[in-house]
Regions:
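Bacterial N-terminal signal peptides that target proteins for export
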Residues: 1-10
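Flanking scaffold residues of small Cys/His-coordinated metal-binding clusters
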Residues: 13
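C-terminal motif of bacterial Sec signal peptides marking the signal peptidase cleavage site
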Residues: 17-20
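Ser/Thr-rich, low-complexity intrinsically disordered terminal regions
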Residues: 22-138
Length: 138
């Protein structure tokens, strides 16, 4: 009886931990307007590559870069595990808006929801790097 309860509790804990884990697939399928947003007056053809550079300069590793459509870039990046963190996933969406401005949205997910030592929001460092890169190109 005790063994059955222990196995049941272990299974329940494993399911809870797995369910709380973020994945790149989950990040890709989140709404494109999720996250912190900043608008830029530069063209999409300039902001897209600059956003990728900004992600790298912020200390993240780029996993994939895709274009869901002709007016949108999606960058998926990761911050690896460390002594104090299980890591994080970051999605940057760069999209042309109808008024010709380019919206950059940064959405961050902790790999494990209970990971309180993770940064939690990479928008500040990414926007800071993007501002520097775009300012240098002007």
């Amino acid at each position: 009886m005790v063994g059955h309860v222990t196995r049941t509790c272990a299974f329940a804990a494993a399911v809870a931990i797995t369910a709380a884990c973020a994945s790149t697939a989950g990040l890709r399928s989140a709404h494109l307007d999720a996250g912190e947003t900043k608008f830029y007056a530069a063209p999409l053809a300039v902001v897209g590559p600059a956003a990728r550079q900004a992600v790298l300069a912020a200390g993240l590793n780029v996993d994939t870069v895709s274009t869901p459509d002709s007016l949108t870039w999606m960058i998926i990046a990761k911050k690896g595990m460390s002594l104090f963190s299980y890591g994080e996933l970051v999605r940057v969406v760069v999209a042309q808006t109808p008024d010709r401005a380019v919206a950059v949205r940064v959405y961050t997910k902790r790999r494990l929801a209970t990971n309180v030592t993770a940064k939690g929001d990479w928008s500040g460092p990414i926007f800071q790097q993007l501002d520097l890169i775009l300012h240098q190109e002007n």
